[in-house]
Amino acid sequence: MGTLVFKDSITKEIVTWKHIQSEKVEDYKYLKDELLKQGYTIQSVVLDGKRGLYKAFDNIPKQMCHFHQKKIIQRYITMNPKLEASKDLKKIMTRLTQTNEKNFTEKLNNWYEKYKLFLDEKTISNTTGKLQYTHPRIRSAYRSLRTNLPYLFTHKNYKNLVINNTTNSLEGGVFSHMKNMISLHRGLTKNMKLKLVDYYLINYYKK
């Protein structure tokens, strides 16, 4: 059980939320449509890269959270990569917040050209006896960057909209306090916890 929360990055208000069993794209679409019905104008969204989520916000400028993107890459190549390809990719990632789309894309393209043959290497699996990619994790890291690339620099391409490049105002500003509050009331039933979350979110902006 979790809670999906939409926050206005300009007014800092929690505008809507929904308790969910698991995170689904349909839930995002539902909340988006609810906001539109209430007369809100959605100028942009900052997302964490969940698969299929970009389609839920068609025709709305979308920014991929830099913090989540870095965490995704870190999960695949670790914090202390051993492979040269991984080390070089990590160097590119360290410039994500300082660079622009043109330079970042150029660096990523050059990296791919340099390591293309390495990425395409295959070996025979000891378990299945079939050919498989030798370096699947770094391939996944590259694929994540390539997929999210069109959304990594929206905050710079739409400067007039003043878009955040992370979801930190939710992660640290809302969820961390909410989790602490729930942990202090571990003995509550699920329904009581949901009511506690509702109360917290209703009164969030009034604090």
Predicted regions and their residues:
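Conserved beta-strand -> loop -> alpha-helix junction used to position metal-binding or nucleic-acid-contacting
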Residues: 44-91
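RNase H-like nuclease fold core
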Residues: 1-44, 51, 55, 148-151
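Acidic/histidine-rich catalytic cores and adjacent linkers
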Residues: 40-51, 91-207
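A broad structural signal for alpha-helix termini and local helix breaks/kinks
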Residues: 39, 57-61, 182
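A generic membrane alpha-helix/interface feature
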Residues: 26, 66, 86, 189-190, ...
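Hydrophobic positions within alpha-helical membrane elements
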Residues: 13, 53, 73, 176-177
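Short, function-defining helix-loop hinge/capping sites that tune catalysis or transport
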Residues: 16, 56, 76, 179-180
